[in-house]
Each structure stands twice: as structure tokens, then as C-alpha cells.
Curated annotation (Swiss-Prot):
It holds the Pfam family ArAE_1_C. The chain crosses the membrane at residues 24-44, 68-88, 100-120, 125-145. Keywords: Cell membrane, Membrane, Transmembrane, Transmembrane helix. The lineage of its organism: Bacteria, Bacillati, Bacillota, Bacilli, Bacillales. This is Uncharacterized protein YqjA. One of its GO terms (cellular component) is plasma membrane. It is a multi-pass membrane protein. InterPro entries: ArAE_1, ArAE_1_C, ArAE_1_C_sf, UPF0421. It comes from Bacillus subtilis (strain 168). It is found in: Cell membrane. Its main location: membrane.
Length: 322
């Protein structure tokens, strides 16, 4: 289905507004203000600000270079080539190379003028200011990403719960008919969610981090532990009492998967369970010994899983998505 994105709308409105303002100011080459606006509208506020600064700096540098080259050497096509040969590496060195295209337009304006005057330089500065200013104005609006981030969070939490349910079932029954589709799916979800959360950070000029991004980083580390413990779980060939105890623990843990932080409760329960294991009679067979060793290792992995969550300060409950 055909859909017009918010960035397309902002670009169209911004371009028209920049050209209109330039015409009102009776600027020469007024259409170039629209080109500058198009180039400066980016997907995030921080990206737009960085691009605007790079283009403004590059354009100011281009005016200075143009004056030196054209007035001292002459208005000749080969002079433009020589100018760009020196100008482009300098913009790269100064890390304002994003402004090469915009500044090249300004250079061509000055070349076509046939004679650089203070009035014409002021005309170009106004074009640059209008184009960049309108782009920054358009980028003041950025749609909220909260709904998408919450949807990702819920799906990841649901997948964690499914994985834990399968671990619980295996420890209780030894059945292993799970397709495991949630593993690659969760990996993909976490990657996409982190990218989206980073975009959200970039949309807030005065904010360098946010809870959503840290939340998905936390889940990523926890998921690495889940992937690591799965082979250990499936190596257990018999059902033992300790396995049933861990299964009950995992059942309660999966019921409490949420963005808040209650890890300390489960860490205490885990410590108590570890002590209880140590006080139980020694295994009678080799199989039981191997099963209990694997389960003890599983306790250590679950502890790491919970420690990671304990460092996260939590996200307050959000309203239903509806």
C-alpha cells in the first residue's frame, strides 16, 4: 500500500518554505535554499544538527576559498577543479565533508557571478541560513517511538517466557519436541529494538541515553546466558528432585518477566535453593551425579541472568497499547 512517510512530508514542506522565504527576501538563486533544506533534513534531530553544522561550516569555508581562487587566479573552469582539489581534502580533515555537495553549489554560484562582492556574499550567507534554519525547524517534530519500543519489549518478554516454559517442561518430563523458533526470532527482535532505541536517543538533543536502550542491552546479555545454558539443560538425561525444584523456580521466574526490577527476590530464593542442594544426600548413580552437576551449573547461569537484571533500575509500567 502506498504510504507517505513523515520525513517526506517534512522535506516537501521545508523545501517549499525555504524557497518561499528566499523569494520574499529577494535573494538570487533562491531555489538553492530548497536544496540545502532537502540535504539537511535527517532521520534524527542530532543527525540533522550535525549535518547542518557541517554544511554551514563547509559553505563558509567555500566562500573564503572561492574568493581567493577566483579573484586571485581567475574565473575559469580549471580554477574550479583546482579549488575542489584542495577544498575537498580540507573538509574531510575538518570532518565537515557532509557539506561538500552544498558548498559546491555555493562555489558555482560565486563562479557564475563573475565577480565576488560583499553584497553577493551576503546573499549566499542568507541562502545557507534560510535553508539550514528551515530544515532545523522541520526537524523539531519527531514522532514518538514509544509504542514501537513497548511492542518490541513485550514480544521479547513473551519469547523469554516461552523459552523458560520449555526448559521447565524438559526438566519435569524430559520431553524435547520444541522447535526452538523463538531463539533466532528473539535475537532478531533484540537487534531491531536496540537500533530503534538508539534512534530514540538521537531524537533528543540534550539526552545521551535512555532506559529503553539500556533495557534492550540488558535483555541481550540475558539472552546470551539463555543460549549458553540450553545445551547444558538438554544434556540432563534423567529427572531428579533438584530438577523439579529448579523447574518450579523457573516457572515462577517466567511469570515475573517484566521491565521492572525484582531480581533481588529471586536471587535470595536461588541462594536458599543452593544451600538446600548442598544439604541433600549425595547422588547414588553416575547418571544422577552428572544430572545434579549440570543442574548446579544451571543454578550458576540463572544467578548470572538475575545479577544482570539487578543492575537495571527498571522501567515503570506503561499503559496498555490498546
Amino acid at each position: 500500500m502506498f504510504k507517505i512517510g513523515y520525513r517526506t512530508i517534512k522535506t516537501a514542506l521545508g523545501t517549499a518554505l525555504a524557497i518561499y522565504i528566499s523569494q520574499l527576501l529577494h535573494l538570487q538563486n533562491f531555489a538553492s535554499a530548497g536544496i540545502i533544506t532537502i540535504l539537511c533534513i535527517q532521520i534524527t534531530q542530532k543527525r540533522s544538527l550535525q549535518a547542518s553544522w557541517a554544511r554551514f561550516s563547509a559553505c563558509c569555508l567555500a566562500i573564503a576559498f572561492s574568493y581567493l581562487f577566483f579573484e586571485l587566479i581567475g574565473y575559469h573552469p580549471f580554477v574550479i577543479g583546482a579549488l575542489l582539489l584542495i577544498f575537498i581534502p580540507i573538509t574531510v580533515l575538518l570532518k565537515i565533508n557532509e557539506g561538500i555537495v552544498t558548498s559546491s553549489v555555493i562555489i558555482l554560484h560565486l563562479y557564475m557571478s563573475g565577480g565576488i562582492t560583499p553584497t553577493f556574499i551576503w546573499n549566499e550567507v542568507q541562502l545557507i541560513t534560510v535553508g539550514i534554519g528551515v530544515a532545523l525547524l522541520m526537524n523539531l517534530y519527531m514522532p514518538s517511538l514509544d509504542r514501537k519500543l513497548i511492542a518490541y519489549r513485550k514480544k521479547i518478554e513473551d519469547n523469554f517466557a516461552v523459552i523458560f516454559a520449555e526448559i521447565e517442561r524438559y526438566l519435569l518430563t524430559g520431553e524435547q519436541d520444541w522447535s526452538g523458533k523463538e531463539i533466532p526470532e528473539t535475537h532478531q527482535l533484540i537487534t531491531e529494538a536496540k537500533n530503534l532505541a538508539y534512534r530514540d536517543v538521537q531524537n533528543h538533543i540534550l539526552r545521551y541515553e535512555n532506559l529503553h536502550y539500556h533495557y534492550f542491552k540488558m535483555r541481550e546479555k540475558q539472552f546470551e546466558i539463555i543460549e549458553r545454558l540450553l545445551p547444558k539443560v538438554t544434556s540432563i538425561s534423567i529427572t531428579v528432585d533438584q530438577g523439579k525444584m529448579i523447574a518450579e523456580f523457573i516457572h515462577d521466574l517466567r511469570e515475573a518477566i517484566h521491565p521492572g526490577n525484582t531480581a533481588y527476590k529471586f536471587l535470595k530464593r536461588l541462594a536458599d535453593m543452593r544451600k538446600e542442594f548442598e544439604e541433600m544426600p549425595l547422588p547414588a548413580t553416575r547418571e544422577e551425579f552428572e544430572a545434579r552437576a549440570a543442574l548446579f551449573h544451571l543454578l550458576g547461569e540463572m544467578e548470572q541472568y538475575l545479577v544482570i537484571k539487578s543492575y537495571f533500575k527498571g522501567i515503570k509500567a506503561q499503559k496498555s497499547l490498546g
